[in-house]
Swiss-Prot record:
Pfam families: Kinase-PPPase (PF03618). This is Putative phosphoenolpyruvate synthase regulatory protein. ADP binds at residues 152-159. It catalyses: [pyruvate, water dikinase] + ADP = [pyruvate, water dikinase]-phosphate + AMP + H(+); [pyruvate, water dikinase]-phosphate + phosphate + H(+) = [pyruvate, water dikinase] + diphosphate. It is an enzyme of class 2 (transferase). Bifunctional serine/threonine kinase and phosphorylase involved in the regulation of the phosphoenolpyruvate synthase (PEPS) by catalyzing its phosphorylation/dephosphorylation. Its EC number is 2.7.11.33, 2.7.4.28. Keywords: Kinase, Nucleotide-binding, Serine/threonine-protein kinase, Transferase. It comes from the Bacteria. InterPro entries: Kinase-pyrophosphorylase (IPR005177), PSRP (IPR026530). Belongs to the pyruvate, phosphate/water dikinase regulatory protein family. PSRP subfamily. GO terms for molecular function: ADP binding; ATP binding; phosphotransferase activity, phosphate group as acceptor; protein serine/threonine kinase activity.
């Protein structure tokens, strides 16, 4: 069974996507065709979005599901004229919040993305630069400045998790790939041993890892299920030998991985 889901926003669409993905993941038997429509900031753009939604409804023979974070009341009114199930995320929560606080909201677009705090912006930019400079074991001399060092086999989610921790929480993150050569005697590389208290491991299901690696190098030893299984068994043995906390990321989104890493390591976020 297929249905179309739209994520509609006057900004980047990230909020609508995040909430929408969380909700739709509860309906595993339905295949959703997902469409993001960001920066809908005028009456004309809203009507164009409505036309696309109505077209999908006609083609699918079923109402699309629309997750909307439109703030402007006129745009929201136009949207509600389309043939779809509208989940108005601002409309659902803004009015009760106004009633409780006794204050009318500004209904201004992109308030959440304004750079209100120059210091927070600086922290975020510096954290992202650090994550990029210390990605994939390229440099290890600055590990003393890292808040956390993610380790794991190739293609296990280290880089995107590091970038998310930097962007969302302002943390200085590094990551280091463990290879077959590191598993001979289960010794940690010297660069990691010196910062063992900062290490956090990621692991993943062997079949899932094989599928991910096959997208890059199909048919190679690197992507074979046998190779992936061997690496992961040795990896988890290394984690256990050195008492390194780790997380199975197979069924988790990057957001979920990052939040759990933060909690399990007891790290304090620099950005609120």
């Amino acid at each position: 069974m297929k249905r179309t889901a739209f994520y509609l926003s006057d900004g980047t669409g990230i909020t609508a996507e995040t909430l929408g993905h969380s909700m739709l993941s509860q309906f595993g038997s339905i295949e959703f065709i997902q469409v993001t429509l960001p920066f809908v900031q005028s009456d004309e753009q809203t009507r164009e979005a409505v036309a696309r939604i109505n077209k999908a409804a006609k083609e699918d023979g079923a109402k699309p599901v629309v997750f909307s974070t439109l703030v402007n009341t006129d745009h929201r009114a136009i949207l509600h004229g389309c043939d779809a199930l509208i989940l108005d995320l601002f409309g659902a929560f803004l009015r009760p919040l106004e009633d409780e606080l006794g204050v009318r909201s500004s209904h201004k677009i992109n308030q959440s993305h304004a750079i209100r705090d120059a210091e927070s912006y600086r922290i975020r930019i510096n954290a992202v630069h650090f994550a990029l400079d210390n990605d994939d074991g390229a440099r290890t001399r600055h590990y003393d400045q890292a808040d956390i060092i993610l380790i794991g086999v190739s293609r296990s989610g280290k880089t995107p998790t590091c970038l998310y921790l930097a962007l969302q929480f302002g943390l200085f993150t590094a990551n280091y790939p463990l290879t077959e050569d590191d598993f001979d005697d289960l010794r940690l590389p010297k660069a990691l041993m010196e910062h063992k208290h900062k290490l956090f491991g990621l692991t993943i299901d062997a079949d899932r890892l094989s599928a991910i690696r096959s997208e890059r190098k199909a048919g190679s030893k690197y992507a074979s299920p046998r190779q992936c299984d061997m690496e992961l068994r040795a990896l988890e043995a290394m984690y256990n030998k050195h008492n390194i906390p780790y997380l199975d990321a197979t069924e988790l989104s990057i957001e979920e991985i990052s939040t759990r890493v933060l909690a399990m390591k007891g790290l304090k976020r620099r950005l609120q």
